[in-house]
Amino acid sequence: MQIFVKTLTGKTITLEVEPSDTIENVKAKIQDKEGIPPDQQRLIFAGKQLEDGRTLSDYNIQKESTLHLVLRMRGGMQIFVKTLTGKTITLEVEPSDTIENVKAKIQDKEGIPPDQQRLIFAGKQLEDGRTLSDYNIQKESTLHLVLRLRGGMQIFVKTLTGKTITLEVEPSDTIENVKAKIQDKEGIPPDQQRLIFAGKQLEDGRTLSDYNIQKESTLHLVLRLRGGMQIFVKTLTGKTITLEVEPSDTIENVKAKIQDKEGIPPDQQRLIFAGKQLEDGRTLSDYNIQKESTLHLVLRLRGGC
């Protein structure tokens, strides 16, 4: 069959191929026609970079399909992938490679299917559609490879309009990961999402298992009012912390934000406003705490009551 290869200069090359040809074969044909070495070629189809060892039929490339040829920047780089067994894999990548591409390279080297791979960098699980540069992964960075437990689970997310979204997740997924999955499905930016479970707002850095969210649990999605506000928290040392909050945030949420900023565990925090100690389950609006209000933070004595 014939396929077309379009270059960034707008030139279109016609190739005679078979569905069983590998991407490597196709690059060799391009080299024969155009003189471009295969290791400088990147072929893109349907927005996806094609891996050498796969075939045209693997990517559902049919007659008269058009591939896009991008010249590989001579700024390819090496990164390392460390497995839980302690083995380190070296990969040749580019900043523009997607996480999906990286998983395909790992599959080529190690035989682990991409859907069983979870890649972690700087404590964050990497999402397939993002690129290495999105996560600021640079040359000689080390990613961590965790095998996905078979036993991923479904959860439901219910919106205020009554729509229910089904998500495939794992207990170890962070709330941040879940918001990214909702963005992929619904297009809602994570910073506009608030997720509620068992009456509690879920914090980005925590995992589903931290909140005991199990298979077929239902979370509630509330869109963040673009009326978030700033408040101040003053410590006994005189330091003032600025927090982004909403009137509907609970005192517990505020303590979690303080922990994220200052590292002080919530159970050691006492928050005072207008001479009154604030209770975890109440909200800022319950106490009439408004924008630019100042709370006072007192550290709870260990063993105090």
Swiss-Prot record:
Cross-link (Glycyl lysine isopeptide (Gly-Lys) (interchain with K-? in acceptor proteins)): 76
Domain of life: Eukaryota
Modified residues (ADP-ribosylglycine): 76
Positions bearing the site annotation: Essential for function: 68
Residues of the propeptide: 305
UniProt crosslink position (Glycyl lysine isopeptide (Lys-Gly) (interchain with G-Cter in ubiquitin)): 48, 82, 87, 103, 105, 124, 139
Annotated positions of the Phosphoserine modification: 65, 141
Zinc found in the keyword field: no
InterPro entries, per the entry: Ubiquitin-like_dom, Ubiquitin-like_domsf, Ubiquitin_CS, Ubiquitin_dom, Ubiquitin_ubiquitin-like
Domain Ubiquitin-like span(s) in chain numbering: 1-76, 77-152, 153-228, 229-304
Keywords: ADP-ribosylation, Cytoplasm, Isopeptide bond, Membrane, Mitochondrion, Mitochondrion outer membrane, Nucleus, Phosphoprotein, Repeat, Ubl conjugation
Site positions per UniProt: Interacts with activating enzyme: 54, 72
Gene Ontology cellular component annotations, sorted alphabetically: mitochondrial outer membrane; nucleus
Gene3D superfamilies, A to Z: Phosphatidylinositol 3-kinase Catalytic Subunit, Chain A, domain 1 (3.10.20.90)
Family membership: Belongs to the ubiquitin family.
Subunit architecture: Interacts with SKP1-KMD2A and SKP1-KMD2B complexes.
Leftover remarks: Ubiquitin is encoded by 4 different genes. Uba52 and Rps27a genes code for a single copy of ubiquitin fused to the ribosomal proteins eL40 and eS31, respectively. UBB and UBC genes code for a polyubiquitin precursor with exact head to tail repeats, the number of repeats differ between species and strains. For the sake of clarity sequence features are annotated only for the first chain, and are not repeated for each of the following chains.
Descriptive protein name: Polyubiquitin-B
Source organism per UniProt: Ovis aries (Sheep)
